[in-house]
Amino acid sequence: MSLFGQATTSTVSNATGDLKKDVEVAQPPEDSISDLAFSPQAEYLAASSWDSKVRIYEVQATGQSIGKALYEHQGPVLSVNWSRDGTKVASGSVDKSAKVFDIQTGQNQQVAAHDDAVRCVRFVEAMGTSPILATGSWDKTLKYWDLRQSTPIATVSLPERVYAMDCVHPLLTVATAERNICVINLSEPTKIFKLAMSPLKFQTRSLACFIKGDGYAIGSVEGRCAIQNIDEKNASQNFSFRCHRNQAGNSADVYSVNSIAFHPQYGTFSTAGSDGTFSFWDKDSHQRLKSYPNVGGTISCSTFNRTGDIFAYAISYDWSKGYTFNNAQLPNKIMLHPVPQDEIKPRPKKGR
């Protein structure tokens, strides 16, 4: 998809990108935006919000968006995800439930229940049936659900509350409180294949799997991101780096890395943070590909579309300063950034 007639190359040649062509999504959520997810089959964007609603938009070639559907939970919605065939949207909520919305029928139904908030939802390929929904909760469990059944087909006990989760087959990675990282191979979905401690010293805020399912990136509240390979023989390629910081003399303002997203074609990735900026990175050449100016508010979540030529990000309060700092004057926007190839393509390592 060519978003509103964009060129295949950027008009900006320096290290700072341009936001002038970014387009705002019409009729955004009315409270903090918690998650964004594009359909793998069409230009549909799902957004979850603290206003207890899930909204689904159609993004047109002009860059304009049209609201296509809306459904509600009984509490703030924290996570959204699409089924592989693009016919269903799953959502997890503070109301301790997960729901699935059918795009074709326009109906939603509760498909999962926990003893505490459902922090993350992901459709997975496991256990010989499809689709299976994995739900990670603050009740310290991961559950798998066959959408045709009212009880989970399997439950995995976790060391702590789920803070972030992502899946690229066969890898399912769950980050919990106390900096635990649980790695699951979906060929054995009820077993924790590897339990590791985050290499970052502070609380995990975001997580995303590599596009080949052989590793993951994690971000912390302390302005750091880490790249982790699953195979021990590639451990020498693991590293972490600083990001989303404002250096002033000998001190620095440090911001949370709220969102990480991998480009579906190139495997390069984005980070977005509480400082109101996002950047594109190449993990293999250890380079920042492009940074972008402040967008006018904290970025709470972000994602690429299926072809990688649209980067969606939400300008919204991220709750990093607690309830008392939230107010009605803060923006709630979803922006669509056209992604020229030269801003996101991998680069050779320096010195080669």
UniProtKB/Swiss-Prot annotation:
PROSITE patterns: WD_REPEATS_2, WD_REPEATS_REGION
InterPro entries associated with the record: G-protein_beta_WD-40_rep, WD40/YVTN_repeat-like_dom_sf, WD40_repeat_dom_sf, WD40_rpt
Gene3D superfamilies to which the protein is assigned, alphabetical: YVTN repeat-like/Quinoprotein amine dehydrogenase
A Gene Ontology biological process term: poly(A)+ mRNA export from nucleus
Record's keyword terms, sorted: Nucleus, Repeat, Transport, WD repeat
GO molecular function ontology, one term from the record: RNA binding
Task of the protein: Required for mitotic cell growth as well as for spore germination. Functions in cell cycle progression through trafficking of proteins required for mitosis. Has a role in the mRNA export process.
Subunit structure: Interacts with rpn15/dss1 and uap56.
Protein family according to the UniProt entry: Belongs to the WD repeat rae1 family.
Protein name, as recorded: Poly(A)+ RNA export protein
